[in-house]
Every structure is written in C-alpha cells, then in structure tokens.
C-alpha cells in the first residue's frame, strides 16, 4: 500500500510507521513504528470492567488541530450503548464509557486516562445537538471505547495480520 504514516512523539521526534491492520466495527487501527527508539515505553491499559462512575479521567487528542490537548472530567456512565454509522451506512453499537471531559473533532483515536495514568479507553465520539459534524462540539457527553475491548480488538488484529479486519467481538 502507498499509505505513509508518520508518528510524532512528545519530544518532537518523528518516526515512520506501518499499518498492521484496522477494524471497521470499532474504527480502531494498529500501527507499528518502523524503527522505534529503544527507550520508548508502552502505555499501560486499565481493566475497564473495574471502572466506577465518578472516577477522574483525562482525554488527550488534537481537537480542531490543536496538538497535545488534555481535558479532564469524570466517568459519567458505563456500558452506554452508542450507535454510529460506518462508511457503508451500517449501524454499529458499542457499549462505551461515557465521560464529561471535552471531546471535539480531532480527539477521536486519542487515549482517555485514569488518575493512575492508565488507558481506560479510546476517544471515539460525542453526543451533539449539531446537525453536521462540521459544527459539532463538546456538550459534556463524550464516549470512549473501553480499554478491554480495545485490547481484544488490537490483539486480534495483530494475530490476524490483515490490513482489513472486521471484528466479530462484541462489547460486554
């Protein structure tokens, strides 16, 4: 594939990466740095089944193109059924973690952390009163794909090693 992926780390260093695979049902992808630095540390994933409503969270992303943005809030609800439509107009339901940390266009794919610095989910979508995604913004109802589902899908993508992957895993 002609897809070129560049990853910029917090220190500003850029690295080429390769797409390992994607999952259309969760809109998740796995990439691999081609020549990662030897001191690069992976994030730790929390057990999303142990999350509690009221727990402090921080969402990281690039909303509206503003790099390295962090917003804070709490877990508002667990196992919230969220329906999104994929590129083929198929409806996909994920039992998401609802958070009130501001999520805006550009945050999707970024991590949501707990107070211990562990990933509890991946920012995915927001509830909005806007009629178009161009005017959508945070009203305090954001959703993250739970970390346990993220881990299962990523492990399956890595095991499958196919660029196009459709998960049959259901969120629990």
Predicted regions and their residues:
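Serine-dependent protease modules
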Residues: 1-167, 171
């Amino acid at each position: 594939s002609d897809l070129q992926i560049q990853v910029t780390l917090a220190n500003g260093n850029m690295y080429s990466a390769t797409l390992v695979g994607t999952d259309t049902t969760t809109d998740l992808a796995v990439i691999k740095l081609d020549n990662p630095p030897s001191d690069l540390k992976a994030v730790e994933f929390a057990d999303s089944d142990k999350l509690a409503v009221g727990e402090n969270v921080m969402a990281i992303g690039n909303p509206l193109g503003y790099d390295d943005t962090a917003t804070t809030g709490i877990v508002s609800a667990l196992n919230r059924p969220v329906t999104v439509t994929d590129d083929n107009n198929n409806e996909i339901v994920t039992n998401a973690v609802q958070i009130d940390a501001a999520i805006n266009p550009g945050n999707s794919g970024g991590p949501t952390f707990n107070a211990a610095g562990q990933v509890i989910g991946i920012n995915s979508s927001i509830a909005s009163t806007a009629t178009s995604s161009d005017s959508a913004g945070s009203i305090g109802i954001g959703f993250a794909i739970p970390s346990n589902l993220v881990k299962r899908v990523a492990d399956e993508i890595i095991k499958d090693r196919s660029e196009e992957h459709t998960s049959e895993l259901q969120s629990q």
